[in-house]
Amino acid sequence: MMSKRRLFRWPAPRTVCLGCLALVFTTLVTMFLYMSEPLDIQPDPEPVNNQIFRQLSEITNTYTNASASEVGLVLAATQKEDLGWLLNYCRDHGTIPFIYTTDTPPAPYLLVPATTRGREATAYLSYIVDFYDQLPKYTIFIHSNVDQWHNDLFGPRTSSVLPHLRLEAVDAQGYVNLRCEHNPGCPTSVNPWEPTQIDIEKDDIRAFFPQVYETLFNVGPEKVPQHIGNVCCGQFAVSRERILQRPRRDYERMLKWAAETELTDSFGVGWVFEKVWHVVFGMEDIYCPRYEQCRCDAYGWCGPLPSGETLQAVRAPRSKGKST
């Protein structure tokens, strides 16, 4: 006999509904249990630059005015800049970094200036105001990049220049530019009372230089010089004694002008200070030491010169020369 064919039957609707509900319930319970478990999520690694900033700030935080370190390095930096060279230098030479952020919002770990207008100019002034009562014996103001075209001796790397700097020259002179080459800046870089017609028509800061000079130095127009000249640019060493020759309120006044002036923009603020740093720190309005003598005083490179002359480096009375 032929067997009967077995017919397929669909499950009853009620059975299907119960099965779906069971599946949904099981899924929800599983998700709840999974989400209740603590997730082993590793935090994102700290950016390399932030790691360097943190390590530099740890060195800064060790500083007191009784610190064994005599030398502070002051600079402005953005979060994108690689300061690995500075970290290595400070560790190798026992110097203290004072790094001011120019970012908005401020970069982590760095010191915050009173204003970011003028970039390194206001970082330098903020440092003096912040640490006026506990300055290291020597302060060297530098730019943040590892290579600087301003460095005219020992190559472009600031880390190659600093070890050769004679701190005895800073003792003797109070202010020492890290650069010796006269061009640009010497013999004259600004003629305050003789702006060009183009400067006047464009409302360039040069057209207002007498007014700016009077404000920065709290003097009358009769004290504004006819000419200003100095070795470029914004890298120099200053002794504690020379910084303290001005009261703190002088530096605060300069900072206030930088933050509030409507005569120029941030770039112009920085430009102004590059023209007058030597005046801020007690040098003549035109300060252009002979190139060979500057090289001898600042770095001990005294000859003999091609002419056969051998120079004598400046010395501070009763002081022992050191290098950074």
What are the residue ranges of the model-derived segments?
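ER/Golgi luminal nucleotide-sugar-dependent glycosyltransferases, focusing on the catalytic module
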Residues: M2-T324
